[in-house]
């Protein structure tokens, strides 16, 4: 998808990131709203990819296609993701991860010093985050293309992730390699890596659900 219209996908990715960053800068509620809207934007990416596959040209306005789908279900999914992320942060704090509010932290060097010997906590956080993101990876597309409740979409996404664990791990590793390579040396490669990631969100969904036998397709709860 990205190779067929790289400039549009780069523009869609930039628009998504700019909106997200702008929301995060809003005091109190901005971060919450930004998190709630993430599944909506990823639904937009999936819809755009399917549209492109059908022979239609993607457009910048496609960034908001997700808002034309069952918005409440997508926002509920965002709330689930936010709750999971907060639970992970709470767990890491309980395990002893230094926090931004720690009075001993004034510089990056202070944080590195306090983190010494606790690097394993970061590994735990990375693994838990990857598990949550992976388990819910298909949910935005499921809500965009099927008449499902949020809970049912989450169940189908989890089932698909577990059933295709090897492929999910390989995809995650490949994505990590692409992002690490893109971030070096000055992050210029992310201009390509991020659009490739958002464009690929539909590919996995299509491989698992649209090529499945009819009896295996998701049905409404």
Predicted features and spans:
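Hydrophobic alpha-helical membrane segments
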Residues: 1-221
């Amino acid at each position: 998808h990205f190779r067929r219209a790289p400039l549009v996908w780069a523009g869609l990715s930039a628009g998504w990131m700019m909106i997200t960053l702008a929301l995060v800068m809003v005091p109190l509620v901005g971060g919450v709203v930004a998190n709630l809207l993430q599944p909506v934007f990823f639904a937009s990416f999936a819809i755009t990819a399917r549209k492109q596959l059908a022979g239609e040209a993607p457009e910048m306005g496609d960034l908001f296609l997700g808002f034309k789908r069952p918005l409440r279900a997508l926002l509920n999914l965002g709330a689930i993701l936010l709750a999971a992320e907060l639970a992970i942060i709470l767990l890491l704090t309980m395990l002893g991860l230094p926090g931004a509010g720690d009075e001993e932290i004034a510089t990056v060097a202070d944080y590195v010093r306090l983190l010494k010997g606790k690097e394993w906590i970061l590994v735990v956080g990375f693994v838990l985050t990857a598990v949550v993101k992976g388990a819910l990876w298909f949910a935005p597309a499921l809500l965009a293309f099927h008449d499902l409740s949020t809970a049912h979409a989450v169940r189908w996404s989890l089932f698909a992730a577990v059933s295709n664990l090897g492929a999910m791990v390989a995809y995650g590793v490949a994505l990590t390699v692409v992002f690490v390579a893109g971030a070096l040396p000055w992050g210029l490669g992310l201009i390509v890596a991020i659009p490739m990631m958002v464009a690929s969100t539909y590919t996995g969904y299509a491989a698992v659900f649209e090529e499945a036998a009819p009896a295996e397709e998701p049905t409404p709860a």
